[in-house]
């Protein structure tokens, strides 16, 4: 198998692109390991961020529709709450009257007819609680966090939702729909909970997949293949990797586009997907 260079980083960037080499240090691979955090950002127009009292009242009035309750409420001017959902604790930060949470960078936007100007919005963050922060990548934590964020996005005047580990921003109803479908057993929502970034050579690299599968993925491009078809294939592979979990040895899989070779890096943090000749 001829392994042509498909990385999005230029060959003279000082990074070793050999899949058999040790993984680069964090920050060396710009696309694969730049994901900033494990929170969900809920963005509001100025003056519309909720207070701790408003969140507590919303949960009390939901009659179980939002499966969460307040377990710790400091003074309201501290601007945060601890919530319990499915036996797991989460923190909601950036509430009024405290300062808004940091918004972060955005690499992809989904679901908007016309996206808002992010610099005009204010964020609150839904984060894994301190007691479970070390397990932020465990499926029960991610699924509960995503479901709770979807409920809040529909019940509050949210203007946009950010999935921090992928640096994506979504229209609230779009976010809620893809999360609900996924939690009901549907395909993993790669267009939102990960970013799929296209290289000049037609390859596609993920950002944020490592939270779900332990590694980022890069799919080799194919000459003459329409970009939409490459994207569909990348979505299939991401769904497979999320369902399969960590891949530690090379393997081949069958797809509608033919057989593919999955080759993990030596450290397991990067997965190359090749198209055997």
Q: Predicted regions span which residues?
A:
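Cationic, low-complexity basic patches in intrinsically disordered or flexible, solvent-exposed regions
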Residues: 3
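Short, extreme N-terminal segment that most often corresponds to the first beta-strand
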Residues: 14-72, 86, 270-277
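Short acidic, S/G/P-rich loop/turn micro-motifs used as interaction or catalytic elements
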Residues: 49-50, 131-135, 225-227
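Internal, hydrophobic cores of structured domains that mediate oligomerization or house catalytic pockets
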Residues: 88-190
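N-terminal low-complexity, intrinsically disordered segments
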Residues: 46-117
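Structural alpha-beta junctions
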Residues: 61-69, 146-161, 240-249
């Amino acid at each position: 198998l001829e392994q042509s260079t498909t990385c999005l980083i230029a060959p003279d960037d000082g990074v070793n692109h050999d899949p058999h080499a040790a993984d680069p240090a964090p920050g060396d691979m710009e696309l694969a390991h730049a994901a900033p955090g494990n929170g969900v950002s809920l963005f509001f127009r100025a003056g519309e961020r909720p207070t701790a009292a408003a969140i507590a009242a919303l949960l009390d009035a939901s009659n179980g529709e939002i499966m969460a309750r307040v377990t710790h409420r400091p003074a309201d001017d501290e601007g945060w709450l601890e919530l319990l959902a499915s036996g797991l604790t989460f923190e909601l930060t950036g509430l009024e009257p405290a300062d808004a949470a940091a918004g972060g960078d955005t690499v992809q936007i989904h679901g908007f007819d016309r996206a808002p100007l992010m610099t005009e919005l204010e964020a609150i963050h839904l984060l894994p609680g301190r007691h479970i922060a070390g397990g932020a990548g465990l499926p029960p934590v991610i699924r509960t966090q995503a479901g709770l964020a979807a409920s809040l996005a529909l019940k509050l005047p949210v203007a946009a939702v950010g999935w921090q580990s992928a640096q994506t921003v979504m229209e609230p109803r779009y976010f809620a729909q893809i999360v609900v479908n996924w939690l009901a057993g549907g395909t993993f929502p790669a267009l939102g909970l990960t970013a799929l970034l296209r290289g000049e050579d037609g390859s596609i690299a993920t950002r944020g997949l490592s939270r779900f599968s332990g590694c980022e993925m890069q799919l080799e491009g194919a000459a003459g293949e329409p970009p939409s078809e490459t994207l569909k294939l990348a979505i299939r592979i991401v769904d497979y990797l999320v369902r399969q979990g960590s891949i530690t040895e090379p393997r081949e899989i069958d797809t509608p586009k033919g057989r593919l070779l999955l080759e993990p890096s030596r450290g397991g943090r990067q997965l190359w997907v090749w198209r055997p000749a």
